[in-house]
Amino acid sequence: MAQLVEHNLAKVGVAGSSPVVRSKRNSPTTTVAGLFLYLSPRLEPERGRAFWVVAVALFAANVRFGRIIVGISHNLVAREIRPMATEKSSSRSWMSDAAIYQIYPRSFKDSTGSGLGDIAGITQQMDYLERLGIEAIWLSPFYPSPLVDGGYDVADYCDVDPRLGSLDDFDDMIAAAHARGIKVIVDIVPNHSSSQHPWFKAALAAGPGSPERARYIFRDGRGEHGELPPTNWNANFGGPAWTRVADGQWYLHMFTPEQPDFDWSCPEVHALFCDVLAFWSDRGVDGFRIDVAQGLAKDLDRDDLDRWHLAEGDDMVDDGTHPLWDRNEVHEIYREWRRVFDRYNPPRSAVAEAWVLPERQYLYARPSELGQTFNFEFAKATWTYDDMHTAIEKGLKAAVESDSAST
């Protein structure tokens, strides 16, 4: 699976928004299936040197390059080096060695002159995408959304934002992609919904103790009149992680107040997302990128919650007992999803965006679960030989342990 580092490499001094390097695997044990970097169209000298640090580190990890595709921004220019003879490896998802192009629909191509990119615009550019030599496109969220968080605040998981088109437009886009041998990946956001989702509106209207409220994480406050939040946590995007509603209860939001967290102990939440995955799979979607994959299962009934931090990556433990992140129970969810994926021929693929300790990455990438996970050690590593070498080695180790491909 080509590494899709999204916006994270911007934090370490690399700007831009498109896949740059792809390497094709040669064997299960000496593999870097692909590395997606985000480079500025005009590389400054130090950033150019950083590129070669990556290349040297890859070779140092005993990786033999196969085909390499290099591209810059949306105006991606492809070049191909013929692959070397490769050993036959174990069967894995097509994602394992695909060149994947991320599209943010609202900025990619405007087909109507509205000033906003849309689904039909992607269809219009399908010949261009085919010429690049890519094998799949990954669409950032295109669902109805208030856009508090770039579309990751979803108000309806089974529709297209009317500003971007319709389900008919989506079907046309899928057909155009498949006609050219291009697969389609979409984002799924299962940790939270938009506060404008019908379920959350129903939860606010129904009141404490209702089945509607059980779909989200509502708690009574502390203090004599419940005026204090249930815990002392701050959200990942800043500010308190709890918001109080009119009847006095508080709801949890790991990111923004407009993104209330689902309660995954509720069977209705499980059923909703199995239906969502089937809905898009039935329409021809080939794969799913799972947002905040490590954050679904939570334990808020323990007595020591105030000593933990909500921010991703803080206080991480290696035994799956953190109350908020990377809990062992999350893997029951993904085994359930794998049963949905495997109903299709070919089975649908998935990749986890899971910010977890390197030694636990492989759990998400097991064939019985999502099958792939991003190796964010690349995003966190400094642009030095030692750091990149270590990140690659950790990724290869996780790949061997999970019978998946390194990302």
For each feature predicted by the language model, list its residue ranges.
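Extended, structured, electrostatic nucleic-acid-contact surfaces
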Residues: 7
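Hydrophobic residues within beta-strands of alpha/beta enzymes
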Residues: 137, 288-290
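Hydrophobic, Leu/Ile/Phe/Ala-enriched alpha-helical segments that form helix-helix packing faces
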Residues: 16, 337-341, 395, 399
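Short, positively charged low-complexity motifs
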Residues: 3, 16, 24-27, 34-35, ...
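Noncatalytic carbohydrate-binding groove/subsite architecture in carbohydrate-active enzymes
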Residues: 354-407
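Acidic/aromatic-lined carbohydrate-recognition and catalytic surfaces
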Residues: 85-278, 282, 295-358
